A protein has these predicted regions:
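Helix N-cap motif at beta-to-alpha junctions
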Residues: 61-66
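A short glycine-enriched loop-to-beta-strand structural element that forms part of the catalytic core
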Residues: 47-55, 84-107
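A short linear hydrophobic-aromatic micro-motif
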Residues: 41-47
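Active-site-flanking beta-strand signature of metal-NTP-handling nucleotidyl enzymes
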Residues: 3-15
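Active-site-proximal alpha-helical element of nucleotidyl cyclase-like catalytic domains
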Residues: 22-41, 76-78
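Catalytic/regulatory signature loops of cyclic-dinucleotide turnover enzymes
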Residues: 111-132
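Short catalytic/binding micro-motifs of nucleotide second-messenger systems
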Residues: 76-84, 119
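Short amphipathic alpha-helices in soluble, non-transmembrane regions
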Residues: 69-75
Length: 140
């Protein structure tokens, strides 16, 4: 059976913030996605976080595998946010299958990044392009 791409969307139902404003959500999300990937063997190709949730692109054998990954992420979010005194009462998980067309995957990743930046009030055009020399030293 060939592996397929899935997009997993986890979002608070009541549109409340997923994390408190003084909490480093980016580091937390990287931690829980890496942990879920290690526990389930599912490869995640990228994620985008929003004030009210997150979306991930996964590389799975089946929808069941994608669901296991999503459940692991959801459990980690609930346990961690509960421990810092910010309980998420309800959030929904949606799993959708992508095609194997890499352009589709790239388009989805770009869309996720754009929406994530927009949620933070950033403009795609305002992000500077970084240039590096042959030794990896930052030029600008």
């Amino acid at each position: 059976m060939s592996k397929r791409h899935y997009i997993v969307s986890i979002k608070t139902i009541d549109d409340k913030l997923l994390f408190p404003t003084d909490f480093n959500g980016e580091a937390f999300l990287f931690g829980v996605t890496a942990k879920a990937s290690a526990k389930t063997g599912v490869i995640f190709k990228g994620y985008s976080s929003f004030p009210t949730g997150l979306e991930l692109v996964l590389y799975c054998k089946s929808g069941q595998e994608a669901r296991m990954f999503a459940d692991e992420i959801a459990n980690s979010i609930y346990i961690k946010t509960n421990s810092i005194g910010h309980i998420i009462h309800s959030f929904g998980i949606h799993i959708g299958e992508l095609t194997n067309d890499e352009r589709t995957l790239e388009a989805v990743m770009m869309d996720m990044m754009t929406r994530s930046m927009a949620a933070r009030g950033l403009d795609m055009e305002s992000i500077p392009t970084l240039s590096f020399d042959a030794d990896g030293k930052l030029l600008n």
